[in-house]
Amino acid sequence: ILWSRGHAKGNEFTTEDGEPVNSWMPQIIIGAQYVEAAGVALGLKKRKKDAVAYAYTGDGGTSQGDFYEGVNFASAYKANAVFFVQNNGYAISTPRELQTAAPHLAAKGWGSGIPSLVVDGMDPLAMYLAAKEARAWAAAGNGPVLIETLTNRLEPHSTAGDDPLRYRTKEDIAEW
């Protein structure tokens, strides 16, 4: 958060006592974090580390070229990666049905040969179990896993005047 606000301490990815936090700078380009994660994951595999690289994006990020490149690269090299896709049904204000014909965003992982799960993202236990299983699979050298989390957007996408009622019905919001 400090880095995004221009504070110099935000560039220091360590704890207060100087220990590294195993993180990298936030990626501004949507979907590009998947390319970075795939590279880090391949490095972890080559060093035989019991670790995985994680990357997160939302519905819209799965329609970016970098998303496909990262997922495909990680799959081809069986890199130690776990990819999360938060599916709240909208890429900002674009409904999923207008941004992709895929029946589930997890299908985009399947298309690259990656085991992909669809999980109730509103269920903490289901999320924990899916993430734990995915991490074990990837860390064992079996290749990446993609987890699509079905969620609800509880607030507007941004604070820049995004009124969800312009593109969502009250019934849709109340359903959650």
What residues fall within each predicted segment?
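Conserved thiamine diphosphate
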Residues: 45-49, 102-133, 175-176
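Short internal beta-strands
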Residues: 78, 83-86
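Glycine/aspartate-rich loop-and-adjacent alpha/beta segment that forms the canonical ThDP
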Residues: 137-176
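Generic beta-sheet signal
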Residues: 51-55, 81, 141-147
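Cofactor-binding active-site loop characterized by glycine-rich and histidine/acidic residues
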Residues: 1-79, 95-101, 106, 111-113
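Short beta-alpha connecting loops at secondary-structure transitions
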Residues: 90-94, 114-120, 163-174
